[in-house]
């Protein structure tokens, strides 16, 4: 009986203990990642702590920078970078990550670049030249605008350019770490061993582990490499470009460039930006353009951001309709204007040709529809490309889609055929060639290259095409001449959207000399930028002292 009672008491004690003390829960299993992938959270947390991101809400930085003009190279080649237009003196940038706004301002010599262009991508001729030394560029959400001069009129930039500007808020160490905390960022991480850069970092001895964290920022996937000191070094994404498609866009920083800005905040003071691949050993591109922006920007003011960057109504309400305004130049010859760049349609007996396919696919589609109305039931058989600057060539792929043959200078062919007119997928802004590639692109009749001259004819009408050289602005320039109509078609040599010069530049002198040597007799010059003018209005300037 005693044993029975003692057993009962033991059972009661065990039940009471069970009810009084909850059973210890097992620790959840660590999150599993596929082979090659690692947890991004500890990497991001350590990086934020290392450079004091949580203490930084905004920053104003100042210094001197350079501007590389994407797509404005004289000639596309393995060792030819984007041209640097001028230094950006008194460069100042304010980035506010509480409001996701940005303001940039600097001084640059007037008359060298379009007023709407700051650096890198976005150069569009015909939009108006910079006339005041001081330039201001602002970004708030989807709105981007500029002011030429401190009291200049706020002017919106086209949406396809404004949508790229926000990546600058993220392609820096603090901006990336803040963007990684936004809804939808969905961070992912991987690792790799890295050696130093060939020819820069000395003998390659021992690779080091580098972590790569990738986030989404709107439609852009942005990557950051994080070294063993938890410092962000390379921030990289792709942006859409009418010529190069998904174009590499990155900023690079070194550990040595970070300074202590106070309150635990570290911020880089040397900027180095690439737009386009800088690694010609591996990218296999023909174009080597890459350096777009950079320089010593050593004055760092954390949490100083006085300008609210409010969007002006004139910017908020700005529209950018794609319109084509047609002017008949002669029977079967039409100027297709209404934009920064013109095209010219020429009718032949059983086909038509278009002189210049500028800007982008939207522009080309509008022009093509207008040509079909003006010259019905005749295919657009040829499109003549004046030069390989991106704003003049950006619409060519659309003509490939409809089956036209491109006529360009032979020096452009390798660049176009490899980097530009290809089947490479365009994921950020697909165009018609990337969506519906013609099955015989590699074998089809898509190219005619010109060395000195070329003639399109139907036996009645001739369109003579000539190589214009030498030029400082660009290599491989073509012009066209209709002898019966005495119309001279050209790009970038006589721009009537701006007042004519009082003296001729060297390129204009050589253009005039080419017309004289070829014994052409134009009555009017028809520019890609601006309205046609009588040829004597241009030629008479030669009597003045030239530059």
Predicted features and spans:
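Flexible, processing/modification-adjacent segments and terminal tails
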Residues: 31-38, 42, 120-221, 239-247, ...
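N-terminal mature ectodomain segment of secretory-pathway/periplasmic proteins
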Residues: 35-42, 46-152, 187-191, 195-202
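Conserved beta-strand hairpin/beta-sheet module of binuclear metal-dependent hydrolase folds
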Residues: 327-371, 477-496
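Divalent-metal (often Zn2+) His-rich catalytic cores of metallo-beta-lactamase-fold enzymes
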Residues: 487, 511-547
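Active-site metal-binding motif and surrounding structural segment of the metallo-beta-lactamase
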Residues: 362-407, 517-521
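Gly/Pro-enriched, hydrophobic low-complexity segments
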Residues: 204-309, 478-483, 490-491, 496-507, ...
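Short, hydrophobic/aromatic-rich segments at coil-to-beta transitions
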Residues: 55-62, 99-103, 205-214, 231-235, ...
